[in-house]
Amino acid sequence: MALSSSSTTNSLLPNKSQLVQNQSLLPSPLKNVSFTTNSTKPVRFVQPISAIHSSDSSKNPIVSDKPSSKPSPPAATVTAAATTVTKTEWTVESWKSKKALQLPEYPNQEELQSVLKTIEEFPPIVFAGEARSLEERLGEAAMGRAFLLQGGDCAESFKEFNANNIRDTFRILLQMGAVLMFGGQMPVIKVGRMAGQFAKPRSDNFEEKNGVKLPSYRGDNVNGDAFDAKSRTPDPQRLIRAYCQSAATLNLLRAFATGGYAAMQRINQWNLDFTEHSEQGDRYRELANRVDEALGFMAAAGLTVDHPIMKTTEFWTSHECLLLPYEQSLTRLDSTSGLYYDCSAHFIWVGERTRQLDGAHVEFLRGVANPLGIKVSDKMDPSALVKLIEILNPDNKAGRITIITRMGAENMRVKLPHLIRAVRRAGQIVTWVSDPMHGNTIKAPCGLKTRPFDSIRAEVRAFFDVHEQEGSHPGGVHLEMTGQNVTECIGGSRTVTFDDLSSRYHTHCDPRLNASQSLELAFIIAERLRKRRLGSQNVLGQ
Protein backbone atom coordinates (compact mmCIF):
# COMPACT_ATOMS: atom_id res chain seq x y z
CA MET A 1 0.00 0.00 0.00
CA ALA A 2 1.29 3.50 -0.81
CA LEU A 3 0.06 6.98 -0.10
CA SER A 4 -0.29 9.34 -3.03
CA SER A 5 2.20 12.17 -3.18
CA SER A 6 2.97 15.05 -5.48
CA SER A 7 5.51 17.03 -3.55
CA THR A 8 6.59 20.34 -4.99
CA THR A 9 8.74 21.40 -2.06
CA ASN A 10 12.31 22.50 -2.68
CA SER A 11 13.53 20.35 0.20
CA LEU A 12 15.14 16.96 -0.25
CA LEU A 13 13.46 15.83 2.96
CA PRO A 14 10.54 13.42 2.59
CA ASN A 15 6.91 14.18 3.00
CA LYS A 16 5.07 11.83 5.32
CA SER A 17 3.55 10.17 2.29
CA GLN A 18 6.74 9.13 0.54
CA LEU A 19 7.80 6.24 2.70
CA VAL A 20 5.97 3.16 1.56
CA GLN A 21 7.47 3.08 -1.92
CA ASN A 22 10.72 1.53 -2.95
CA GLN A 23 11.34 -0.95 -0.11
CA SER A 24 10.95 -4.56 -1.14
CA LEU A 25 12.13 -8.03 -0.38
CA LEU A 26 15.54 -9.41 -1.21
CA PRO A 27 14.97 -12.65 -3.11
CA SER A 28 15.35 -15.14 -0.30
CA PRO A 29 17.97 -17.87 -0.46
CA LEU A 30 15.77 -20.01 1.76
CA LYS A 31 13.18 -20.68 -0.93
CA ASN A 32 13.60 -23.55 -3.35
CA VAL A 33 16.67 -22.90 -5.45
CA SER A 34 17.87 -24.12 -8.82
CA PHE A 35 21.35 -24.81 -9.98
CA THR A 36 23.33 -27.30 -11.98
CA THR A 37 26.90 -28.39 -11.54
CA ASN A 38 29.24 -28.52 -14.47
CA SER A 39 30.17 -31.91 -15.84
CA THR A 40 33.80 -32.79 -16.30
CA LYS A 41 33.51 -33.16 -20.06
CA PRO A 42 35.50 -30.70 -22.18
CA VAL A 43 32.37 -29.19 -23.73
CA ARG A 44 29.33 -28.94 -21.47
CA PHE A 45 25.92 -28.48 -23.00
CA VAL A 46 23.88 -30.33 -20.36
CA GLN A 47 24.40 -30.31 -16.62
CA PRO A 48 23.32 -33.33 -14.60
CA ILE A 49 21.67 -31.81 -11.50
CA SER A 50 19.00 -29.13 -11.37
CA ALA A 51 16.42 -27.71 -8.98
CA ILE A 52 13.88 -24.91 -8.86
CA HIS A 53 15.36 -21.40 -8.64
CA SER A 54 14.81 -18.91 -5.90
CA SER A 55 12.17 -16.33 -6.80
CA ASP A 56 10.77 -18.49 -9.60
CA SER A 57 7.70 -20.67 -9.66
CA SER A 58 8.13 -23.89 -11.57
CA LYS A 59 6.37 -27.19 -12.10
CA ASN A 60 9.68 -28.90 -12.73
CA PRO A 61 10.67 -31.63 -10.28
CA ILE A 62 13.13 -30.56 -7.63
CA VAL A 63 15.74 -32.93 -9.04
CA SER A 64 16.00 -33.67 -12.74
CA ASP A 65 18.61 -35.21 -15.01
CA LYS A 66 16.80 -34.31 -18.21
CA PRO A 67 18.76 -32.23 -20.74
CA SER A 68 17.62 -28.72 -21.52
CA SER A 69 15.66 -28.35 -24.73
CA LYS A 70 16.69 -24.72 -25.00
CA PRO A 71 18.52 -24.21 -28.31
CA SER A 72 21.83 -22.44 -28.41
CA PRO A 73 21.88 -18.88 -29.75
CA PRO A 74 21.82 -18.78 -33.56
CA ALA A 75 24.96 -17.96 -35.45
CA ALA A 76 25.38 -14.42 -36.69
CA THR A 77 28.01 -12.15 -38.16
CA VAL A 78 28.73 -8.67 -36.80
CA THR A 79 31.08 -6.16 -38.36
CA ALA A 80 32.46 -3.12 -36.56
CA ALA A 81 34.99 -0.75 -38.15
CA ALA A 82 37.76 -2.99 -39.48
CA THR A 83 36.88 -5.92 -37.22
CA THR A 84 34.66 -8.76 -38.41
CA VAL A 85 33.23 -10.92 -35.66
CA THR A 86 31.68 -14.26 -36.55
CA LYS A 87 29.38 -15.54 -33.83
CA THR A 88 29.35 -19.31 -33.70
CA GLU A 89 27.51 -21.66 -31.37
CA TRP A 90 28.18 -20.65 -27.77
CA THR A 91 29.35 -23.02 -25.05
CA VAL A 92 30.77 -22.33 -21.62
CA GLU A 93 34.22 -22.96 -23.12
CA SER A 94 33.90 -21.21 -26.49
CA TRP A 95 35.75 -18.19 -25.09
CA LYS A 96 38.92 -20.31 -25.13
CA SER A 97 39.02 -20.06 -28.93
CA LYS A 98 39.37 -16.26 -28.66
CA LYS A 99 42.22 -14.02 -27.57
CA ALA A 100 41.99 -13.55 -23.80
CA LEU A 101 43.65 -10.47 -22.31
CA GLN A 102 44.44 -9.74 -18.66
CA LEU A 103 44.59 -13.39 -17.58
CA PRO A 104 47.40 -14.40 -15.19
CA GLU A 105 49.94 -17.05 -16.13
CA TYR A 106 49.77 -19.86 -13.59
CA PRO A 107 53.03 -21.82 -13.38
CA ASN A 108 51.23 -24.98 -12.20
CA GLN A 109 48.49 -25.73 -14.71
CA GLU A 110 47.61 -29.09 -13.15
CA GLU A 111 46.89 -27.45 -9.81
CA LEU A 112 44.82 -24.76 -11.55
CA GLN A 113 42.65 -27.34 -13.32
CA SER A 114 42.18 -29.25 -10.07
CA VAL A 115 41.03 -26.09 -8.28
CA LEU A 116 38.65 -25.14 -11.10
CA LYS A 117 37.14 -28.63 -11.04
CA THR A 118 36.61 -28.28 -7.29
CA ILE A 119 34.85 -24.93 -7.73
CA GLU A 120 32.63 -26.46 -10.42
CA GLU A 121 31.26 -28.79 -7.75
CA PHE A 122 30.62 -25.95 -5.27
CA PRO A 123 27.10 -24.48 -4.93
CA PRO A 124 26.33 -21.29 -6.87
CA ILE A 125 26.96 -18.07 -4.94
CA VAL A 126 23.82 -16.39 -6.36
CA PHE A 127 20.68 -17.68 -8.04
CA ALA A 128 19.39 -17.12 -11.56
CA GLY A 129 16.00 -15.89 -10.36
CA GLU A 130 17.69 -13.09 -8.44
CA ALA A 131 19.64 -12.01 -11.52
CA ARG A 132 16.41 -11.91 -13.52
CA SER A 133 14.81 -9.72 -10.85
CA LEU A 134 17.75 -7.32 -11.08
CA GLU A 135 17.42 -7.21 -14.87
CA GLU A 136 13.79 -6.16 -14.48
CA ARG A 137 14.77 -3.36 -12.08
CA LEU A 138 17.51 -2.15 -14.43
CA GLY A 139 14.94 -2.09 -17.24
CA GLU A 140 12.99 0.41 -15.13
CA ALA A 141 16.14 2.52 -14.73
CA ALA A 142 16.61 2.51 -18.52
CA MET A 143 13.17 4.11 -18.80
CA GLY A 144 13.87 6.73 -16.12
CA ARG A 145 11.64 5.07 -13.52
CA ALA A 146 14.40 3.91 -11.14
CA PHE A 147 17.99 4.83 -10.28
CA LEU A 148 20.98 2.50 -9.86
CA LEU A 149 23.32 2.99 -6.89
CA GLN A 150 26.32 0.71 -7.42
CA GLY A 151 29.23 0.98 -5.04
CA GLY A 152 31.89 -0.73 -3.00
CA ASP A 153 35.59 -1.49 -2.89
CA CYS A 154 37.93 -0.97 -5.80
CA ALA A 155 39.21 -4.44 -4.96
CA GLU A 156 38.18 -6.60 -2.03
CA SER A 157 41.02 -8.05 0.01
CA PHE A 158 41.58 -11.05 2.23
CA LYS A 159 43.25 -8.92 4.90
CA GLU A 160 40.33 -6.50 5.43
CA PHE A 161 37.64 -9.18 5.33
CA ASN A 162 35.55 -8.86 8.48
CA ALA A 163 31.92 -8.33 9.46
CA ASN A 164 32.37 -4.70 10.51
CA ASN A 165 33.75 -3.63 7.13
CA ILE A 166 30.94 -5.41 5.29
CA ARG A 167 28.36 -3.86 7.62
CA ASP A 168 29.75 -0.33 7.25
CA THR A 169 29.75 -0.45 3.44
CA PHE A 170 26.22 -1.86 3.44
CA ARG A 171 25.16 0.82 5.91
CA ILE A 172 26.49 3.75 3.86
CA LEU A 173 24.76 2.31 0.78
CA LEU A 174 21.50 2.22 2.77
CA GLN A 175 21.99 5.86 3.77
CA MET A 176 22.80 6.93 0.22
CA GLY A 177 19.82 4.96 -1.06
CA ALA A 178 17.49 6.75 1.35
CA VAL A 179 18.81 10.16 0.29
CA LEU A 180 18.47 9.34 -3.43
CA MET A 181 15.03 7.81 -2.98
CA PHE A 182 13.65 10.96 -1.36
CA GLY A 183 15.31 13.24 -3.88
CA GLY A 184 14.11 11.35 -6.93
CA GLN A 185 10.94 9.83 -5.45
CA MET A 186 11.72 6.66 -7.36
CA PRO A 187 13.07 3.21 -6.48
CA VAL A 188 16.80 3.01 -5.86
CA ILE A 189 18.47 -0.22 -7.03
CA LYS A 190 21.26 -1.02 -4.58
CA VAL A 191 24.09 -3.11 -6.04
CA GLY A 192 27.35 -3.70 -4.19
CA ARG A 193 30.81 -4.03 -5.69
CA MET A 194 31.02 -6.80 -3.10
CA ALA A 195 31.17 -10.57 -2.64
CA GLY A 196 33.50 -11.16 -5.59
CA GLN A 197 35.23 -7.92 -6.67
CA PHE A 198 38.80 -9.19 -6.34
CA ALA A 199 40.51 -9.34 -9.74
CA LYS A 200 41.94 -6.16 -11.26
CA PRO A 201 43.23 -5.48 -14.80
CA ARG A 202 46.73 -4.05 -15.00
CA SER A 203 48.44 -1.79 -17.53
CA ASP A 204 51.63 -3.85 -17.35
CA ASN A 205 52.16 -7.55 -16.75
CA PHE A 206 55.22 -6.82 -14.63
CA GLU A 207 56.30 -4.34 -11.98
CA GLU A 208 59.92 -3.34 -11.42
CA LYS A 209 61.46 -1.96 -8.22
CA ASN A 210 65.17 -1.39 -7.61
CA GLY A 211 66.06 -3.56 -10.57
CA VAL A 212 63.81 -6.44 -9.45
CA LYS A 213 61.06 -7.40 -11.91
CA LEU A 214 58.03 -9.36 -10.68
CA PRO A 215 54.50 -10.09 -11.95
CA SER A 216 52.03 -7.27 -11.28
CA TYR A 217 49.56 -7.59 -8.44
CA ARG A 218 46.23 -8.67 -10.00
CA GLY A 219 44.01 -8.93 -6.94
CA ASP A 220 43.92 -11.19 -3.91
CA ASN A 221 42.21 -14.00 -5.81
CA VAL A 222 45.30 -14.23 -8.07
CA ASN A 223 48.40 -13.20 -6.08
CA GLY A 224 49.57 -11.10 -3.13
CA ASP A 225 50.47 -7.41 -3.13
CA ALA A 226 53.74 -7.84 -1.20
CA PHE A 227 56.68 -7.26 -3.54
CA ASP A 228 58.40 -10.65 -3.36
CA ALA A 229 58.53 -13.61 -5.71
CA LYS A 230 56.38 -15.90 -3.57
CA SER A 231 53.56 -13.37 -3.11
CA ARG A 232 53.49 -12.29 -6.73
CA THR A 233 53.37 -15.82 -8.18
CA PRO A 234 49.75 -16.59 -9.21
CA ASP A 235 48.34 -19.19 -6.81
CA PRO A 236 45.24 -21.21 -7.80
CA GLN A 237 44.38 -21.89 -4.14
CA ARG A 238 43.48 -18.21 -3.80
CA LEU A 239 40.46 -18.87 -6.03
CA ILE A 240 38.96 -21.19 -3.43
CA ARG A 241 39.57 -18.64 -0.68
CA ALA A 242 37.94 -15.95 -2.85
CA TYR A 243 34.92 -18.19 -3.40
CA CYS A 244 34.56 -18.82 0.34
CA GLN A 245 34.92 -15.12 1.19
CA SER A 246 32.37 -14.18 -1.49
CA ALA A 247 29.86 -16.71 -0.17
CA ALA A 248 30.37 -15.57 3.43
CA THR A 249 30.05 -11.90 2.45
CA LEU A 250 26.80 -12.51 0.59
CA ASN A 251 25.48 -14.57 3.50
CA LEU A 252 25.99 -11.60 5.84
CA LEU A 253 24.53 -9.15 3.31
CA ARG A 254 21.41 -11.31 3.02
CA ALA A 255 21.07 -11.30 6.80
CA PHE A 256 21.42 -7.51 6.94
CA ALA A 257 18.97 -7.00 4.06
CA THR A 258 16.24 -9.32 5.33
CA GLY A 259 16.84 -9.66 9.07
CA GLY A 260 15.59 -6.26 10.21
CA TYR A 261 18.80 -4.22 9.94
CA ALA A 262 17.53 -2.51 6.77
CA ALA A 263 14.12 -1.68 8.28
CA MET A 264 13.07 1.93 7.70
CA GLN A 265 12.42 2.23 11.45
CA ARG A 266 16.20 1.93 11.93
CA ILE A 267 17.07 4.79 9.60
CA ASN A 268 18.44 6.89 12.47
CA GLN A 269 20.70 4.03 13.55
CA TRP A 270 22.43 3.76 10.16
CA ASN A 271 24.58 6.84 10.82
CA LEU A 272 28.26 5.96 11.21
CA ASP A 273 29.95 7.30 14.33
CA PHE A 274 32.57 9.37 12.51
CA THR A 275 29.93 11.15 10.36
CA GLU A 276 27.78 11.94 13.41
CA HIS A 277 28.92 15.54 13.84
CA SER A 278 29.69 16.39 10.22
CA GLU A 279 27.65 18.57 7.87
CA GLN A 280 26.52 15.51 5.95
CA GLY A 281 25.67 13.69 9.16
CA ASP A 282 23.51 16.61 10.27
CA ARG A 283 21.68 16.69 6.93
CA TYR A 284 21.11 12.97 7.07
CA ARG A 285 19.87 13.10 10.67
CA GLU A 286 17.35 15.79 9.73
CA LEU A 287 16.10 13.59 6.89
CA ALA A 288 15.94 10.57 9.20
CA ASN A 289 13.90 12.51 11.76
CA ARG A 290 11.37 13.35 9.07
CA VAL A 291 11.17 9.66 8.23
CA ASP A 292 10.43 8.84 11.87
CA GLU A 293 7.67 11.47 11.90
CA ALA A 294 6.14 10.02 8.75
CA LEU A 295 6.27 6.49 10.15
CA GLY A 296 4.50 7.72 13.27
CA PHE A 297 1.85 9.37 11.11
CA MET A 298 1.33 6.15 9.18
CA ALA A 299 0.92 4.14 12.39
CA ALA A 300 -1.56 6.68 13.78
CA ALA A 301 -3.57 6.48 10.55
CA GLY A 302 -3.81 2.73 10.95
CA LEU A 303 -1.27 1.85 8.27
CA THR A 304 1.04 -0.90 9.45
CA VAL A 305 4.76 -0.18 9.43
CA ASP A 306 5.52 -3.80 10.30
CA HIS A 307 4.87 -5.10 6.79
CA PRO A 308 7.90 -6.94 5.34
CA ILE A 309 8.20 -4.30 2.62
CA MET A 310 9.18 -1.81 5.35
CA LYS A 311 11.60 -4.17 7.09
CA THR A 312 13.71 -5.48 4.21
CA THR A 313 15.49 -4.19 1.15
CA GLU A 314 16.65 -5.68 -2.14
CA PHE A 315 20.42 -5.88 -2.52
CA TRP A 316 22.49 -7.39 -5.31
CA THR A 317 26.19 -8.09 -5.90
CA SER A 318 28.46 -7.32 -8.85
CA HIS A 319 32.05 -7.48 -10.03
CA GLU A 320 34.15 -7.18 -13.17
CA CYS A 321 34.09 -10.35 -15.27
CA LEU A 322 37.84 -10.65 -15.65
CA LEU A 323 39.16 -14.05 -14.52
CA LEU A 324 37.36 -16.20 -17.08
CA PRO A 325 38.40 -19.67 -15.81
CA TYR A 326 36.84 -18.83 -12.43
CA GLU A 327 33.71 -17.32 -14.02
CA GLN A 328 33.29 -20.43 -16.19
CA SER A 329 33.56 -22.68 -13.15
CA LEU A 330 30.61 -20.89 -11.54
CA THR A 331 28.43 -20.85 -14.67
CA ARG A 332 25.31 -22.97 -14.28
CA LEU A 333 22.43 -24.04 -16.52
CA ASP A 334 19.16 -22.71 -15.09
CA SER A 335 16.44 -25.36 -15.13
CA THR A 336 13.66 -22.76 -15.11
CA SER A 337 14.68 -20.76 -18.17
CA GLY A 338 17.09 -23.14 -19.91
CA LEU A 339 19.68 -20.34 -19.96
CA TYR A 340 23.21 -20.22 -18.59
CA TYR A 341 23.94 -17.84 -15.71
CA ASP A 342 27.28 -16.83 -14.24
CA CYS A 343 26.40 -17.56 -10.61
CA SER A 344 29.43 -15.77 -9.16
CA ALA A 345 27.39 -12.52 -9.00
CA HIS A 346 24.04 -11.08 -10.02
CA PHE A 347 25.59 -8.40 -12.29
CA ILE A 348 28.94 -8.59 -14.09
CA TRP A 349 30.66 -6.10 -16.34
CA VAL A 350 33.33 -6.06 -19.02
CA GLY A 351 36.11 -3.55 -18.54
CA GLU A 352 37.75 -0.97 -20.75
CA ARG A 353 40.75 -3.26 -21.39
CA THR A 354 38.79 -6.43 -22.25
CA ARG A 355 35.78 -5.32 -24.33
CA GLN A 356 37.25 -6.21 -27.76
CA LEU A 357 34.47 -7.36 -30.12
CA ASP A 358 36.42 -10.49 -31.07
CA GLY A 359 37.86 -11.08 -27.59
CA ALA A 360 37.36 -13.90 -25.11
CA HIS A 361 35.54 -11.80 -22.51
CA VAL A 362 32.84 -10.63 -24.91
CA GLU A 363 32.49 -14.19 -26.20
CA PHE A 364 31.91 -15.50 -22.68
CA LEU A 365 29.48 -12.73 -21.72
CA ARG A 366 27.27 -13.06 -24.79
CA GLY A 367 26.26 -16.54 -23.66
CA VAL A 368 25.34 -15.87 -20.01
CA ALA A 369 21.95 -14.39 -19.16
CA ASN A 370 23.02 -12.09 -16.30
CA PRO A 371 22.47 -8.36 -16.66
CA LEU A 372 25.75 -6.99 -18.05
CA GLY A 373 27.72 -3.77 -17.76
CA ILE A 374 30.05 -2.24 -20.34
CA LYS A 375 32.72 0.18 -19.09
CA VAL A 376 33.13 2.97 -21.65
CA SER A 377 35.80 5.70 -21.77
CA ASP A 378 36.25 8.66 -24.10
CA LYS A 379 38.14 6.28 -26.42
CA MET A 380 34.96 4.34 -27.32
CA ASP A 381 33.86 4.76 -30.95
CA PRO A 382 30.06 5.17 -31.18
CA SER A 383 29.71 2.59 -33.96
CA ALA A 384 31.82 0.09 -32.01
CA LEU A 385 29.57 0.57 -28.98
CA VAL A 386 26.49 -0.16 -31.10
CA LYS A 387 28.11 -3.34 -32.45
CA LEU A 388 29.12 -4.46 -28.97
CA ILE A 389 25.56 -3.99 -27.71
CA GLU A 390 24.28 -5.98 -30.71
CA ILE A 391 26.56 -8.88 -29.78
CA LEU A 392 25.65 -8.88 -26.09
CA ASN A 393 21.95 -8.06 -26.43
CA PRO A 394 20.68 -9.24 -29.83
CA ASP A 395 17.08 -9.34 -28.54
CA ASN A 396 17.31 -5.70 -27.32
CA LYS A 397 15.98 -6.64 -23.89
CA ALA A 398 15.55 -3.78 -21.43
CA GLY A 399 17.80 -4.17 -18.38
CA ARG A 400 20.26 -6.49 -20.10
CA ILE A 401 22.87 -3.81 -20.87
CA THR A 402 24.16 -1.04 -18.60
CA ILE A 403 26.63 1.45 -20.12
CA ILE A 404 29.01 2.68 -17.40
CA THR A 405 30.72 5.85 -18.64
CA ARG A 406 34.11 6.87 -17.20
CA MET A 407 35.53 9.88 -19.02
CA GLY A 408 36.28 12.89 -16.83
CA ALA A 409 33.99 15.93 -16.78
CA GLU A 410 35.19 17.70 -19.93
CA ASN A 411 35.39 14.54 -22.03
CA MET A 412 31.92 13.61 -20.80
CA ARG A 413 30.42 16.77 -22.27
CA VAL A 414 32.17 16.21 -25.60
CA LYS A 415 32.01 12.43 -26.08
CA LEU A 416 28.89 11.19 -24.30
CA PRO A 417 26.36 12.95 -26.60
CA HIS A 418 27.72 11.07 -29.63
CA LEU A 419 27.39 7.72 -27.84
CA ILE A 420 23.83 8.48 -26.74
CA ARG A 421 22.82 9.52 -30.27
CA ALA A 422 24.39 6.43 -31.87
CA VAL A 423 22.63 4.08 -29.46
CA ARG A 424 19.34 5.93 -29.95
CA ARG A 425 19.63 5.77 -33.75
CA ALA A 426 20.18 2.01 -33.49
CA GLY A 427 17.01 1.72 -31.39
CA GLN A 428 18.91 0.03 -28.57
CA ILE A 429 17.64 0.02 -24.98
CA VAL A 430 20.40 0.58 -22.41
CA THR A 431 20.75 1.95 -18.89
CA TRP A 432 23.19 4.89 -18.78
CA VAL A 433 25.32 5.06 -15.62
CA SER A 434 28.12 7.41 -14.55
CA ASP A 435 31.41 6.15 -13.09
CA PRO A 436 32.99 9.46 -12.00
CA MET A 437 35.96 7.76 -10.35
CA HIS A 438 38.24 6.23 -13.00
CA GLY A 439 38.54 9.28 -15.23
CA ASN A 440 39.74 11.46 -12.36
CA THR A 441 42.72 9.64 -10.87
CA ILE A 442 45.85 11.73 -10.27
CA LYS A 443 49.15 11.25 -8.46
CA ALA A 444 49.65 13.30 -5.29
CA PRO A 445 53.01 14.98 -4.54
CA CYS A 446 53.69 12.18 -2.02
CA GLY A 447 53.39 9.61 -4.83
CA LEU A 448 50.04 8.12 -3.79
CA LYS A 449 47.15 7.90 -6.24
CA THR A 450 44.15 10.03 -5.35
CA ARG A 451 40.96 11.47 -6.81
CA PRO A 452 39.79 15.05 -6.20
CA PHE A 453 36.20 15.21 -4.92
CA ASP A 454 35.62 18.36 -6.98
CA SER A 455 36.48 16.45 -10.18
CA ILE A 456 34.17 13.59 -9.21
CA ARG A 457 31.35 16.05 -8.55
CA ALA A 458 32.02 17.84 -11.84
CA GLU A 459 31.76 14.59 -13.82
CA VAL A 460 28.45 13.68 -12.15
CA ARG A 461 27.07 17.11 -13.01
CA ALA A 462 28.29 16.78 -16.60
CA PHE A 463 26.57 13.38 -16.81
CA PHE A 464 23.23 14.86 -15.76
CA ASP A 465 23.69 17.93 -17.97
CA VAL A 466 24.33 15.83 -21.09
CA HIS A 467 21.30 13.61 -20.49
CA GLU A 468 19.13 16.67 -19.92
CA GLN A 469 20.45 18.11 -23.18
CA GLU A 470 19.89 14.86 -25.11
CA GLY A 471 16.50 14.03 -23.60
CA SER A 472 17.79 10.68 -22.29
CA HIS A 473 17.68 9.16 -18.83
CA PRO A 474 20.54 9.33 -16.30
CA GLY A 475 20.09 5.83 -14.92
CA GLY A 476 22.56 5.57 -12.08
CA VAL A 477 25.99 6.04 -10.56
CA HIS A 478 28.88 3.58 -10.08
CA LEU A 479 31.29 4.44 -7.25
CA GLU A 480 34.41 3.09 -5.62
CA MET A 481 33.70 3.80 -1.96
CA THR A 482 33.84 2.40 1.53
CA GLY A 483 32.07 2.79 4.84
CA GLN A 484 35.44 3.25 6.52
CA ASN A 485 36.87 6.62 7.57
CA VAL A 486 39.73 6.51 5.05
CA THR A 487 41.71 9.38 3.54
CA GLU A 488 42.18 8.38 -0.09
CA CYS A 489 40.25 10.99 -2.12
CA ILE A 490 41.06 14.65 -1.48
CA GLY A 491 38.40 17.30 -0.89
CA GLY A 492 34.82 17.14 0.30
CA SER A 493 33.16 19.22 3.01
CA ARG A 494 35.40 17.60 5.65
CA THR A 495 38.40 18.54 3.57
CA VAL A 496 40.99 15.83 3.02
CA THR A 497 44.26 17.40 1.86
CA PHE A 498 47.31 15.95 0.15
CA ASP A 499 49.03 15.94 3.55
CA ASP A 500 46.19 13.86 5.02
CA LEU A 501 46.43 11.05 2.48
CA SER A 502 49.02 8.95 4.26
CA SER A 503 47.17 8.94 7.61
CA ARG A 504 44.44 6.44 6.63
CA TYR A 505 45.30 5.28 3.10
CA HIS A 506 44.26 1.61 3.15
CA THR A 507 43.21 0.76 -0.41
CA HIS A 508 44.84 -2.23 -2.14
CA CYS A 509 44.29 -0.65 -5.52
CA ASP A 510 42.58 2.67 -6.38
CA PRO A 511 41.44 5.46 -4.01
CA ARG A 512 37.89 5.28 -2.63
CA LEU A 513 35.41 7.83 -1.34
CA ASN A 514 35.00 7.61 2.42
CA ALA A 515 31.57 7.52 4.08
CA SER A 516 31.29 11.29 4.51
CA GLN A 517 32.29 12.00 0.90
CA SER A 518 29.90 9.29 -0.35
CA LEU A 519 26.99 10.78 1.57
CA GLU A 520 27.86 14.28 0.35
CA LEU A 521 27.84 13.06 -3.24
CA ALA A 522 24.47 11.35 -2.64
CA PHE A 523 22.93 14.68 -1.59
CA ILE A 524 24.33 16.33 -4.74
CA ILE A 525 22.85 13.60 -6.96
CA ALA A 526 19.56 13.69 -5.07
CA GLU A 527 19.26 17.41 -5.76
CA ARG A 528 19.68 16.77 -9.50
CA LEU A 529 17.09 13.99 -9.37
CA ARG A 530 14.70 16.31 -7.55
CA LYS A 531 15.13 19.08 -10.13
CA ARG A 532 14.63 16.58 -12.93
CA ARG A 533 11.46 15.29 -11.27
CA LEU A 534 10.04 18.77 -10.71
CA GLY A 535 10.91 19.71 -14.29
CA SER A 536 8.99 16.70 -15.57
CA GLN A 537 6.01 17.60 -13.38
CA ASN A 538 6.04 21.16 -14.71
CA VAL A 539 6.06 19.91 -18.31
CA LEU A 540 3.14 17.57 -17.60
CA GLY A 541 1.24 20.38 -15.88
CA GLN A 542 1.47 22.75 -18.84
UniProtKB/Swiss-Prot annotation:
Annotated stretches, region: Disordered: 54-76
One Gene Ontology term, aspect cellular component: chloroplast
Reactions accelerated catalytically: D-erythrose 4-phosphate + phosphoenolpyruvate + H2O = 7-phospho-2-dehydro-3-deoxy-D-arabino-heptonate + phosphate
Class of this enzyme: transferase
Primary location class: plastid
Transit peptide: first to last position: 1-76
One Pfam short name: DAHP_synth_2
Subcellular location: Plastid, Chloroplast
EC number: 2.5.1.54
Inducing stimuli: By the herbicide glyphosate and wounding.
Pathway(s) served: Metabolic intermediate biosynthesis; chorismate biosynthesis; chorismate from D-erythrose 4-phosphate and phosphoenolpyruvate: step 1/7
GO molecular-function terms, A-Z: 3-deoxy-7-phosphoheptulonate synthase activity
InterPro entries: Aldolase_TIM, DAHP_synth_2
Activity control, per UniProt: Activation by tryptophan (a hysteretic factor).
Family: Belongs to the class-II DAHP synthase family.
Matches recorded under PANTHER family: PHOSPHO-2-DEHYDRO-3-DEOXYHEPTONATE ALDOLASE (PTHR21337:SF0), PHOSPHO-2-DEHYDRO-3-DEOXYHEPTONATE ALDOLASE 1, 2 (PTHR21337)
Name of this protein: Phospho-2-dehydro-3-deoxyheptonate aldolase 1, chloroplastic
Upper taxonomic lineage: Eukaryota, Viridiplantae, Streptophyta, Embryophyta, Tracheophyta
